[in-house]
């Protein structure tokens, strides 16, 4: 067994801790992680942004996975929370001499209030995921679940909790060149004011399908190898499944270019089709990243 720790800060606006955790690695099938880190929910949330094709997360990830949640809890937490998690790999097969896990599990208990915040109620939230590789290298099927609650009013009494439950199913394929990923999320969120008799359950859902294909080429003048991939994503979200005016569909296309091993330029164009709006929305984004 051995220890691994990580401490990551953000000084862009005001100093704050982003990641701060310790891993106790005991065996392939059983490990412990404690501190502040990304919750084990969905494919996209635990992944590094440098591996994703979009500058922004899909709507359903943002709204139901601790980024800009429909219940406004853990907003701007980047899918992170404070807690303890067990994780490991069970069973494996070999492909070209490399051992590939068949089943990966993660199960954690969290405060449920986002990063750099103390617990706001007396309960704890549970998040867990299972990923299965069905014998094909690069192919994974997954499901994850979040069972939690939050304070309807942080200034109110402790027993004014509302449910915040989410369930996901997804699959992805990551080959040498082709990358395809899709997830569906369904959620139940308690909303409203119990004191006024206006408490209700908000049912939300959505899914996305994203794809990209890597091309490699070498610059004749410099001899430097470049990596570039066209990317695209179909992104559908229903904040309230009973109200069609909350439906929105985003169509994204872009280019992911690595002119050097530690330099990345990502450009996205998104066409936003919201039922509540008469006109389409247009968003053009560019992001430059440098790895050290």
PLM region descriptions:
Residues 118-120, 287:
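Hydrophobic secondary-structure block in the mid-to-C-terminal portion of proteins
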Residues 1-115, 122-124, 131-140, 208-221, ...:
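Outer membrane beta-barrel
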Residues 6, 21, 36, 135, ...:
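Outer-membrane beta-barrel pore domains
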Residues 111-116, 153-157:
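Surface-exposed cleft-lining segments at the edges of enzyme active sites
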Residues 126-129, 167:
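Short, hydrophobic/aromatic alpha-helical segments in well-folded domains
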């Amino acid at each position: 067994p051995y220890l691994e720790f990580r401490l990551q800060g953000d000084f862009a606006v005001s100093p704050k801790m982003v990641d701060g955790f310790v891993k106790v690695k005991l065996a392939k099938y059983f490990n412990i992680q404690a501190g502040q880190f990304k919750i084990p929910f969905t494919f996209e949330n635990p992944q590094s942004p440098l591996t994703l094709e979009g500058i922004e997360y899909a709507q359903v990830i943002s709204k139901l996975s601790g980024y800009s949640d429909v219940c406004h809890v853990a907003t701007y937490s980047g899918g992170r929370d404070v807690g303890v998690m067990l994780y490991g790999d069970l069973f494996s097969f070999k492909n070209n001499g490399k051992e590939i896990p068949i089943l990966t599990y993660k199960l954690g208990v969290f405060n449920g209030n986002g990063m750099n915040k103390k617990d706001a109620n007396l309960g704890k939230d549970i998040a867990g995921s299972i990923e299965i590789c069905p014998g094909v290298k690069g192919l994974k099927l997954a499901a994850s679940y979040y069972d939690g609650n939050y304070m309807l009013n942080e200034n109110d009494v402790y027993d004014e909790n509302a449910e915040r439950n989410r369930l996901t199913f997804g699959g992805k394929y990551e080959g040498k060149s082709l990358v395809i990923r899709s997830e569906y999320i369904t959620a139940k969120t308690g909303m409203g004011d119990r004191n006024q008799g206006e408490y209700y359950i908000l049912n939300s859902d959505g899914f996305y399908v994203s794809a990209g294909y890597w091309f490699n080429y070498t610059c004749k003048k410099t001899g430097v190898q470049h990596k570039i991939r066209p990317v695209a994503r179909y992104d559908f979200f229903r904040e309230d499944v009973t109200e069609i005016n909350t439906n929105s569909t985003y169509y994204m296309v872009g280019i992911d270019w690595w002119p050097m091993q530690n330099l990345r330029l990502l450009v996205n164009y998104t066409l936003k089709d919201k039922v509540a709006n008469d006109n389409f929305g247009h968003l053009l984004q560019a992001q430059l990243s440098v790895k050290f």
